[in-house]
Curated annotation (Swiss-Prot):
Keywords: Aminoacyl-tRNA synthetase, ATP-binding, Cytoplasm, Ligase, Nucleotide-binding, Protein biosynthesis. The gene is gltX. One of its GO terms (biological process) is glutamyl-tRNA aminoacylation. The keyword Aminoacyl-tRNA synthetase applies. Monomer. Catalyzes the attachment of glutamate to tRNA(Glu) in a two-step reaction: glutamate is first activated by ATP to form Glu-AMP and then transferred to the acceptor end of tRNA(Glu). This is Glutamate--tRNA ligase. Belongs to the class-I aminoacyl-tRNA synthetase family. Glutamate--tRNA ligase type 1 subfamily. A motif ('KMSKS' region) lies at residues 240-244. CDD domains: GluRS_core (cd00808). It is found in: Cytoplasm. ATP binds at residue 243. It is an enzyme of class 6 (ligase).
């Protein structure tokens, strides 16, 4: 009987949930869901100096926002230190590990010598078979794995293929430090085994760890999980991903106005493909996802492509949901509190009414919010630099005449205000654009906005006539 699929996402809480970590979590989640299994979450908080509660909170919040729900309780690695020590002691008792009393100075000398000779194996194994009676009384030993000296350690990786290491080049890795704390290598193996993890899907920067961890599995006689080391994410120029490329936390993408569904769709296509398909519903991702379709080459992050995809998702989202998403965004942007203070039943209704025009122009929720600024603006409007160039003495006089032409419009609708403006343009011999642009600046403070007649309808008669009066000569 085959074991049920269990994957895991195991971040270190030393910072935010990186975009690469978000993709790793997504791949683990998709694989587990496709096979009717579970994805577990383990917080690898053994680095007590760098692990922080705010980072843990950011990871949990980021996963939830992305729509990645893990199964069962969150496991905290540090809390399992006693179990990790128990395994190290078992290996010691079985002769598969040994106490190493090398001093810091001796270890430094070994490393320097190995590097000078071009050897990757840095520890010389001097305490591997040494008589324990030689041990200095004042030094707490580390516990090292008695790794094989000959032969090969082989990983049949689902992405990288067959990967082989010569054992003569691998150190006897430390399992327990001198102070009794377990190392990352030991803790990961013990936790994955105890959590019944069947598939380890992680970045290929962990590939060298796979060889060392397999040696622990072998020493314990445990079954090695299936491994899939996925390529890292690079910038558009092929260099290591940096902040200028998009190496930000998932929380930053939320604050920049990306929809979780759009970011999920973008991330799944970074390194994985399903024919030429670009757009996926969540269920389509689950149905199609397969480790064999992950490439070995580094994926390239393209902000323009993400923006375009996000714009598509915004246009496909219903108007009421976008209003809700905008309200949520206010918690994460500097101008949020000021706009939130202006949110009333009236402005919410105006936002909903304006949404069809707003969402056609926006690639992010932040752009959408910015374009909706005219709804929340105080009188008299702050007019931007481009708008100021439109407001000449002549156009201010024109605005006064426009206001008079609009006063008798009833009922106040986009169609009726448009008819009044077209009549005004014909009577004055002006092109509609020459009428619309001063009107736009007077009502929004900008030279760009949603359709001007939609703006008139959204703001309503009283507000429009008041704003026009503010700017009229």
């Amino acid at each position: 009987m085959t074991r049920p699929v269990v994957t895991r996402f195991a971040p270190s809480p030393t910072g935010f949930l990186h975009i690469g970590g978000g993709r790793t979590a997504l791949f683990n989640w998709l694989y587990a869901r496709k096979h009717g299994g579970k994805m577990l979450l383990r917080i690898e908080d053994t680095d007590r100096q760098r692990s922080t509660q705010p980072a843990i909170d950011a990871i949990l919040d980021g996963l939830k926002w992305l729509g990645i729900e893990w199964d069962g309780d969150t496991v905290y690695q540090f809390a399992r230190a006693a179990r990790h020590r128990e395994v190290a002691e078992q290996l010691l008792a079985e002769g598969k590990a040994y106490r190493c009393y090398a001093t810091a100075e001796e270890l430094t000398a070994m490393r320097d010598k190995a590097r000078a000779e071009g050897r990757s194996k840095l520890y010389d194994g001097s305490w591997r078979d040494r008589d324990p009676s030689d041990a200095p009384a004042d030094l707490n030993p580390t516990i090292r794995l008695r790794a094989p000296l000959t032969g090969e350690t082989v990983i049949e990786d689902q992405v990288q293929g067959r990967v082989v290491w010569q054992n003569e080049n691998l150190d006897d890795l430390v399992l327990l430090r001198g102070d009794g704390t377990p190392t990352y290598m030991l803790a990961v193996v013990v936790d994955d085994h105890d959590m019944d993890v069947t598939h380890i899907i992680r970045g290929d920067d962990h590939l060298i760890n796979a060889a060392r961890q397999k040696q622990i599995y072998d020493a314990m006689g445990w079954e090695l999980p299936v491994m899939a080391h996925i390529p890292l994410i690079h910038g558009p120029d092929g260099s290591k991903l940096s902040k200028r490329h998009g190496a930000l936390g998932v929380d930053a993408y939320r604050a920049m106005g990306y929809l979780p569904a759009a970011l999920r769709n973008y991330l799944v296509r970074l390194g994985w493909s399903h024919g030429d398909q670009e757009l996926f519903t969540t269920q389509e991702m689950i149905d199609a996802f397969d480790l064999s379709a992950i490439g070995r080459s580094a994926a390239r992050f393209d902000f323009a492509k993400l923006e375009s995809l996000n714009g598509h998702y915004i246009r496909q989202t219903d108007d009421q949901s976008l209003v809700t998403l905008l309200e949520d965004l206010l918690h994460y942007v500097p101008q949020g509190p000021a706009i939130a203070a202006r949110l009333t039943d009236t402005t919410r209704a105006q936002l909903l009414q304006a949404m069809p025009g707003l969402k056609e122009r926006a690639k992010t929720l932040l752009e959408l919010l910015d374009n909706a600024g005219f709804i929340f603006a105080d009188r008299p409007l702050a007019v931007d630099t481009k708008g100021q160039t439109v407001l000449t003495p002549e156009t201010r006089a024109l605005i006064g005449r426009l206001r008079a032409a609009l006063e008798d419009v009833s009922p106040w609708t986009a169609a009726n205000t448009e008819a009044a403006m077209r009549t005004f343009a014909e009577q004055t011999g002006l092109k509609l654009g020459a009428v619309a642009q001063p009107l736009r600046v007077a009502l929004t403070g900008r030279t760009t906005s949603p359709g001007i007649f939609d703006v008139l309808a959204v703001l309503g008669r009283e507000e429009c006539l008041s704003r026009l009066a503010d700017q009229a000569a």
